């Protein structure tokens, strides 16, 4: 009988990837990025270890929503004080801080525990093309858009 081999924490190699969010659908992009942050794309994926990679997302302000979500979708936040419910539409959030749209979408797809918080720290979202991680030599990732595989 074969025994499952587990990778040691010292042997985990973290790769860096860069993704251009321009013209990408929020949900489809978020699921792929969350998969990479968790490490599920690797052969040696282990659920109880953080062996995910770093992901840099550029052009976060150019991400797309389908339908009328730009005006109809509402983000809620409560300050935990009476009358403290705050609402923002996607259009308002995009003007204030476009990176929060993708960060929130991806964070909610990660585990809700210490490991999920550590995996979320490997996400780096930026408005525009510039980012400070050129020294890591990130590998460019492209995802097949729906309808492009014909």
From Swiss-Prot:
GO CC annotations on file: cytosolic large ribosomal subunit
Transmembrane intervals: none
Highest taxon in the source lineage: Bacteria
InterPro entries assigned to the protein according to its UniProt record, in alphabetical order: Ribosomal_uL13 (IPR005822), Ribosomal_uL13_bac-type (IPR005823), Ribosomal_uL13_sf (IPR036899)
Pfam family, one: Ribosomal_L13
Molecular function per GO: mRNA binding; structural constituent of ribosome
Disulfide bonds, paired cysteine numbers: none
Keyword Protein biosynthesis annotated: no
Any single GO BP term: negative regulation of translation
Alphabetically ordered keywords of this record: Ribonucleoprotein, Ribosomal protein
Subunit relationships: Part of the 50S ribosomal subunit.
Family: Belongs to the universal ribosomal protein uL13 family.
HAMAP family to which the protein is assigned, alphabetical: Ribosomal_uL13
Record's function text: This protein is one of the early assembly proteins of the 50S ribosomal subunit, although it is not seen to bind rRNA by itself. It is important during the early stages of 50S assembly.
PANTHER family reported in the protein's UniProt record: LARGE RIBOSOMAL SUBUNIT PROTEIN UL13M, RIBOSOMAL PROTEIN L13
Protein name: Large ribosomal subunit protein uL13
């Amino acid at each position: 009988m074969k025994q499952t081999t587990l990778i040691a924490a010292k042997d985990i190699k973290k790769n860096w990837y860069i993704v251009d969010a321009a013209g990408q659908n929020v949900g489809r992009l978020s699921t792929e990025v969350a998969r990479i942050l968790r490490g599920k794309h690797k052969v040696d994926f282990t659920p109880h270890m953080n062996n995910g990679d770093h992901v840099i997302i550029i052009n976060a302000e150019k991400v797309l929503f389908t339908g009328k979500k730009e005006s109809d979708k509402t983000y809620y936040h409560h300050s935990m004080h009476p009358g403290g419910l705050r609402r923002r539409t996607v259009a308002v959030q995009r003007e204030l801080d476009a990176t929060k749209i993708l960060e929130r979408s991806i964070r909610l797809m990660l585990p809700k525990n210490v490991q999920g918080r550590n995996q979320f720290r490997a996400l780096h979202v930026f408005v525009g093309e510039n980012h400070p991680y050129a020294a890591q030599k990130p590998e460019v990732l492209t995802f097949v858009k729906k309808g492009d595989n014909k």
